[in-house]
Amino acid sequence: MNKYRFIFLLLIPLTMAFSSYSCKIAVLKYNGGGDWYANPTSLNNLIQFCQANLNMNINPIYDVVDVESSELFRYPFIHMTGHGNVVFSISESENLRQYLKAGGFLHIDDNYGMDAFIRPEMKKVFPELDFIELPFTHPIYHQSYNFENGLPKIHEHDNQPARGYGLIYEGRLVCFYSYESDLGDGWEDPNVHKDSQNIRISALKMGANIIQYAFTN
């Protein structure tokens, strides 16, 4: 067992010891000027949905964690979003790499405009890996909720279908990248985007699948 995985496994139970919740999840804070803080109500709503429908015991208050922080290793699931620029330094890239190698999971949700920036930055994290489009048969689409056609389309931008990409390290999906879907918008409070209830539920179900997959794989 490498030292990073040891730290990861050690810190999660330590965090749980001070809480009645089984775990806590976090939003990734990054540099470069992009709005890492976008969709401020989305993760709270997703957590509430998971609690109510999948009986998950996640702390309802998510944290914000810096990409270079050792605190990263406290969280089994990290969510990342934004519309624009992302920059990882060498040390930030290495920290994120070690977190993912140690068993952590990163969900990147393109909030539109992120694609051109996140791909080269994740290449710093895993130079040896490329994002691959996951087939519709992948288990992430078939956890508690079945999505026979892959990611749901929440908001329209460039007349492109929603696509789910992954980084697979030593046989494990360590990063799931939802592109042209806008899942996070669908998780927000109903009055923010005024999406239909069906659209919101579809987004929340897919988000729940992602968390469930991350927790069990």
State what each model feature region is:
Residues M1-F8:
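Bacterial N-terminal signal peptides that target proteins for export
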Residues F8-A17:
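Bacterial N-terminal signal peptides
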Residues C23-K24, K29-G33, T41-S42, D115-N191, ...:
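An acidic, glycine-rich "communication" segment
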Residues I25, F77-A116:
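Short alpha-beta junction capping motif
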